[in-house]
Amino acid sequence: MTRLLAAVAFAFGAMLAPHTPAHAQTASLANPASLNERAPPTFKVKFDTSKGVVVIEVKRDWAPNGADRFYNLVKNGFYDNARFFRVVSGFMVQFGINGDPKLSSVWRTAGIKDDPVTQSNKRGYVTFATAGPNTRTTQVFINFGDNTGLDGQGFSPFGQVVTGMNIVDQLHAGYGEGAPRGRGPDQGRIQQEGNAYLMRDFSNLDYIKKATIER
């Protein structure tokens, strides 16, 4: 089975990153190779979710390739309206499949090179999912607990939740593990049908309304 596993308080004076027009975001997202901007050494991402606000602080030196990919995806709106489609209590919550199947499809093979594991997969730490060497694309998970067993498998955290971990704990977990092992959404169908499938068959899933970068 594919090993896909699978943040409002800021310092005074924090500034929003420059806004990218929606049409430019869509065009950029259709060309993964064009989204190669280097991320700042440290930055924060605010998720306005259906349950409340979650803030993730990213430190580029933890996992440079992962931090750069996350920065570019957030800046260009990839995670807006994305569902938390896999929520396994005590383990992790996973997200990162775009709700538009056309966009999702162009990112499926846009893998980045692996980063060394410099941090442990502790509670609140944020990591890209992977299906093997150099296969990280867009899917991300937040650890509910201390999942140190993932460290030796190449799962390299690039950030951590600094505000709103209590919100993460409240994300709907009623569907459990995904199909075929559980009664949750099938990742293949999410890729093929997008949010239409999730809204129809898994309407209780929480989601990211808007993701923004804050310095």
Predicted regions mapped to residue ranges:
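Bacterial N-terminal signal peptides that target proteins for export
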Residues: 1-8, 15-18
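Cyclophilin-like peptidyl-prolyl cis-trans isomerases
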Residues: 13, 18-215
